[in-house]
Amino acid sequence: NTDSLRQPDARLRALNAEASTAGPRQLVYCTKVGATRPDEMYLVGAHMDGIGWGEAANDDGSGTALVMELARVLSAPDVTTERSIRFVLWNNEETGLNGARAY
């Protein structure tokens, strides 16, 4: 198969998963410390959970990718910021914004 967009077979696969899962809230974060006002902070965040396959790619896979890319670019040693920037990824947004509330 030379078509990179074609699936290896025509069968549809489904993931059996609950839309809501009980358990602890989790988050991942890193902080770029500001040069002149380190105690003042911007938050750049997104949630890691999603519902469905295609929908989750945008809600919020695209946001997660953006936060990670911003963290990568702004972490370069030659990039300085006046204020600190915290890059945060949390879960349980799809169950009522619980991850962000817990943060």
Model-derived regions, located:
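Soluble metallo-hydrolase cores and metallopeptidase-like ectodomains found primarily
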Residues: 1-56, 69-72, 76
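Acidic/histidine-rich catalytic neighborhood of metal-dependent amide-processing enzymes
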Residues: 24, 50-103
